[in-house]
């Protein structure tokens, strides 16, 4: 079929709406290109957090959740909600995969290691899930249980780990369910950009007990703060007795459960610990007894998971493919999974008629505040070429800058990131105009519109609960009104714009009247 309109959907990652100017990188930077493009055309606000995207009430959204909802055209209830319900009801403790792992490690007389992000952020993990796993291990009489605590500082304030780790230590002491064995910033343990040198340092601490030593977790964190190293960047630290013996390193035959429910930042460490073949660094011949993921981290990983994927059917990209339309996806490395895997409903699939292009994120800087433009200009150049080719009917692009630089807490850098993305929008607006495309601009969640925590005065490095914009830019829609909505309204809206039949499973009415 021939669509009524061809559409470019731009997702400005971490670009929320907040009216106040103070510490608002978007307002302070100014967006002259976006303002010029969007001013004559319809605009509305979309909710991106809590129940609106299938998360618990008051829980901030994230890129994984956002892109899944955008592609599905309905509210997709997230793993966090599913696992919360299982933990609260006792269903988790009866999970057959969990019981097999616990009974196996007990029978073997080996240790159980629980790895994951100790954080209330709710983006990658939940402390309630960790507590439920610890209780289950005690109920199954597992004798040796160790927690390897990864510290946040991105989805939480940058120096907030002491409170969360103290809560964990209190729980462990009161319930006699285990001990903390290592403390590591997520910068090392949760890389997703193939920076294997970081993962290697985490592995060395987990498996060999190598790295800085500390008598307990709180001392390790305080020592890092004294060196002006915040939670995210705490070096992999081994908790050890007075003679230097590690509290609990991962050894041959042990069992590991990675309790992060979000996949993208759990994959690399999982590969290092559990894959039979691995060539990125010398692992020293570790052979685990069991390795269990909280969720399915990748369809190609032949590893058991406590919760299998709940994948939405008849989603927007699938609809495009069935109609014989050509689609193009692009982003830089940091957000490439979001415009592919997550937009495709959590599937490792390339639909018929779907082309992709990955632009590498910068690797010459440690953090992106040092290069706020990241790879936005390269992404834009490739996308303009594809729009001008006349080959496609739909295109999706994600600009990572507002989110990735926003996570640094550096207002000046975030403003530069905003300016770079605004320039790119100007170029894309011109390309859409000369090719007759509709330009739809939105975001998956907020971030850089609030760079300082209003309560503490510290840098704000997490996502926000703020709504995000939705612009529909094309002369055919001048003067039309858009309803306020949620991210799941985007796909039904694009179906109407393109003249496509909306699937029954897309149960949202969209934003157009």
From Swiss-Prot:
Pathway: Carbohydrate degradation; glycolysis; pyruvate from D-glyceraldehyde 3-phosphate: step 3/5. The lineage of its organism: Bacteria, Pseudomonadati, Myxococcota, Myxococcia, Myxococcales. It comes from Myxococcus xanthus (strain DK1622). Catalyzes the interconversion of 2-phosphoglycerate and 3-phosphoglycerate. It comes from the Bacteria. Keywords: Glycolysis, Isomerase, Manganese, Metal-binding. InterPro entries: Alkaline_phosphatase_core_sf, BPG-indep_PGM_N, Metalloenzyme, PGAM_B_sf, Pgm_bpd_ind. Monomer. This is 2,3-bisphosphoglycerate-independent phosphoglycerate mutase. The keyword Isomerase applies.
């Amino acid at each position: 079929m021939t669509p009524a309109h061809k559409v470019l959907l731009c997702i400005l990652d971490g670009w929320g709406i907040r009216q106040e100017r103070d510490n608002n990188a978007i307002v302070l930077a100014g967006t002259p290109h976006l303002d010029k493009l969007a001013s004559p055309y319809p605009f509305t606000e979309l909710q991106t957090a809590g129940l609106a995207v299938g998360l618990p009430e008051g829980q901030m959204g994230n890129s994984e959740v956002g892109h899944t909802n955008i592609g599905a055209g309905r509210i997709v209830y997230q793993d966090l909600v599913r696992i919360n319900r299982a933990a609260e009801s006792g269903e988790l403790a009866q999970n057959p995969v969990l019981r097999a792992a616990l009974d196996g490690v007990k029978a073997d007389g080996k240790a159980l290691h629980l790895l994951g992000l100790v954080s209330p952020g709710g983006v990658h993990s939940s402390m309630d899930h960790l507590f439920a796993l610890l209780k289950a291990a005690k109920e199954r009489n597992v004798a040796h249980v160790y927690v390897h605590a990864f510290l946040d500082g991105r989805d939480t304030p940058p120096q907030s780990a002491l409170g969360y780790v103290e809560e964990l230590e209190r729980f462990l002491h009161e319930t006699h369910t285990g001990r903390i064995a290592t403390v590591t910033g997520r910068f090392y343990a949760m890389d997703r950009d193939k920076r294997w040198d970081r993962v290697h340092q985490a592995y060395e601490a987990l498996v060999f007990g190598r790295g800085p030593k500390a008598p307990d977790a709180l001392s390790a964190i305080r020592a890092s703060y004294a060196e002006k190293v915040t939670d995210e960047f705490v070096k992999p630290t081994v908790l050890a007795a007075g003679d230097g013996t590690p509290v609990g390193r991962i050894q041959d035959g042990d069992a590991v459960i990675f309790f992060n429910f979000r996949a993208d930042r759990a994959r690399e460490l999982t590969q290092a610990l559990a894959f039979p073949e691995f060539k990125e660094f010398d692992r020293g011949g570790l052979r685990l007894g069991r390795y269990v993921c909280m969720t399915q981290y990748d369809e190609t990983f032949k590893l058991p998971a406590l919760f299998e994927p709940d994948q939405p059917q008849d989603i927007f990209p699938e609809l495009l493919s069935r109609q014989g339309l050509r689609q193009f996806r692009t982003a830089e490395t940091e957000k490439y999974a979001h415009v592919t895997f997550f937009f495709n409903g959590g599937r490792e699939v390339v639909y018929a008629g779907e082309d992709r292009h990955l632009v590498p994120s910068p690797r010459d800087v440690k953090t992106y505040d040092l290069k706020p433009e990241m790879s936005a200009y390269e992404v834009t150049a490739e996308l303009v070429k594809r729009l001008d080719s006349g080959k496609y009917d739909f295109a999706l692009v994600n600009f990572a800058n507002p989110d990735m630089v926003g996570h640094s807490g550096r207002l000046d850098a975030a403003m530069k990131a905003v300016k770079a993305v605004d320039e790119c929008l100007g170029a894309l607006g011109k390309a859409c105009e000369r090719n007759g495309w509709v330009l739809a601009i939105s975001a998956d969640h907020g971030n850089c519109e609030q760079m300082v925590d209003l309560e503490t005065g510290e840098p704000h490095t997490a996502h926000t609960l703020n709504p995000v914009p939705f612009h529909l830019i094309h002369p055919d829609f001048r003067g039309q009104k858009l309803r306020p909505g949620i991210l799941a309204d985007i796909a039904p809206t694009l179906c109407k714009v393109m003249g496509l039949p909306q699937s029954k499973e897309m149960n949202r009415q969209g934003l157009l009247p």
